[in-house]
Amino acid sequence: MVEKKFLEAVKKYSLISEGDRILVAFSGGIDSTVLTYLLIKFRDHLKISDIYLAHLNHSLRKESDEDQRFCEDFAKKYGLEIFTKKVDIKSLAEKEKKSIEQKAREERYSFFRKVMEERSINRLATGHHLSDLVETMIMWFIQGNRKGIKGFRPKERDIIRPLYLINKDQIENYAREKGIEYRIDITNFETDFLRNRIRHNIIPHIKGINPSLEGSLLTLSYFLSLDDQYLEEESEKISQKFLNGKIELEELLVYDKALVYRAIQNWIYRKTGVYPSYRQIMDIMEIIEKKEGTKSIRLSPEYNLIRRYSTLYIEKVKEKTEPYQYRIKPGEKIFVKEANLYIKSYIETDYTLDKLKDERKKVCFQIESMEDAEFVVRNRRKGDRFIPFGRKKEKKLKDVMIDLKIPSDMRENIPLVVYGNKILWIAGYKRSAYFPVTEKGKKLICFELEEV
């Protein structure tokens, strides 16, 4: 039965081709040992060129070194080349603030990839089987993970799972019949970890309701994978449209929500290497439906997703801007590091009123005794008020910035040019009503932005 299902999976899913060089992820446990035994037995039949073993010693159990010796002896017995590496997973996980399971997986696959690259190996075979598939689907269902609930496929790029159609009981019976020795990991019989609780407590109860649980979930996995593949391909086409670094919501929201959230996931992953959680995706979907103001969501310690009105951006997390202040006199030029720009001040005598209309990059004021005047460039302070040009009444600076649609996450950085207690200019946005230019021929004090 096991051998028949092994060969069926190899053929049905095109797992092995003539001349393949296969690296087995070899723990010494029953699954990887039976897998290796089957590969050796059918090596000639499947025309496999080479079989190699790779064992990562996680240093998690007192028996870890004995596990490694077993793997080395097994390789020697069957004339296979084995690659081993020893790492302290617990210390690495603590240092990087990751779970032991996550860090162990990262180290294993990094090790496997290195071996494959160095030895020109084109297939990585793992011992995942049908019972693993069932456990995985139930585990992700319990955790509400859409991407994981479909389980794993028998073949994903160069990773193959030849035991895909074989369950755990069948593997154990086969090992017993063939006298195959293997290492036993006692943690597999503990119930502290979610997967083991599913294996030993939950699945037996479900099988009491549906004895064909494995077959049912195998079929479900197949159809969920088909749906997922199609939606991923379509959403990838959408995310490709936003390679310039931002998303215009008018262009995105013409698509169905099933594609929108996937496109956003792909876009975020491509930009940051971070795969957003479902809680984050739900928050993102909520804020993109509202186009007023600015909203942000922390994706990771390094990145924020920001919606500024109808546009989505991804930006690195900025340190909180502290109050800053610079002094500037006519004829001087200063660098405002907090805004990453220069502001220069100078006296203007040759001008026309028409040329003074661009208040975003340059503003001029008609101030008496300007040669001795000293101005301050600073960011906003609590209680700041401002009189926009063309108005007579003061407004709260915060309200003016909202009217100008200045994103909330940028307001602390924007330079203000101040004279005495009067804010003359919201640099790059709006001049005040103070000291308007009313007569030609008068000397003017001007301020101009220069970007780095």
Curated annotation (Swiss-Prot):
Q: SUPFAM superfamilies, from UniProt?
A: Adenine nucleotide alpha hydrolases-like, MesJ substrate recognition domain-like, PheT/TilS domain
Task: Report which superkingdom the organism of origin falls in.
Answer: Bacteria
Q: Which GO terms describe its cellular component?
A: cytoplasm
Give the Enzyme Commission number: 6.3.4.19
Enumerate the subcellular locations listed in this protein's record, separating them with semicolons.
Answer: Cytoplasm
Q: Which UniProt keywords apply?
A: ATP-binding, Cytoplasm, Ligase, Nucleotide-binding, tRNA processing
Xref: Gene3D superfamilies:
1.20.59.20, HUPs
- Which biological process annotations from GO are given for this protein? tRNA modification
Query: Which CDD domains does this entry report, sorted A to Z?
Result: TilS_N
The GO terms this record gives for MF are: ATP binding; tRNA(Ile)-lysidine synthase activity
What InterPro entries has UniProt attached to this entry? Lysidine-tRNA-synth_C, Rossmann-like_a/b/a_fold, TilS/TtcA_N, tRNA_Ile_lys_synt, tRNA_Ile_lys_synt_N
- Where does it mainly reside? cytoplasm
Q: Where does ATP bind?
A: S27, G28, G29, I30, D31, S32
- Which reactions is this enzyme annotated as catalysing? cytidine(34) in tRNA(Ile2) + L-lysine + ATP = lysidine(34) in tRNA(Ile2) + AMP + diphosphate + H(+)
| Family of this protein | Belongs to the tRNA(Ile)-lysidine synthase family.
The record's comment about this protein's domains reads:
The N-terminal region contains the highly conserved SGGXDS motif, predicted to be a P-loop motif involved in ATP binding.
Instruction: State its role.
Output: Ligates lysine onto the cytidine present at position 34 of the AUA codon-specific tRNA(Ile) that contains the anticodon CAU, in an ATP-dependent manner. Cytidine is converted to lysidine, thus changing the amino acid specificity of the tRNA from methionine to isoleucine.
| Official protein name in the record | tRNA(Ile)-lysidine synthase
Taxonomic source organism: Persephonella marina (strain DSM 14350 / EX-H1)
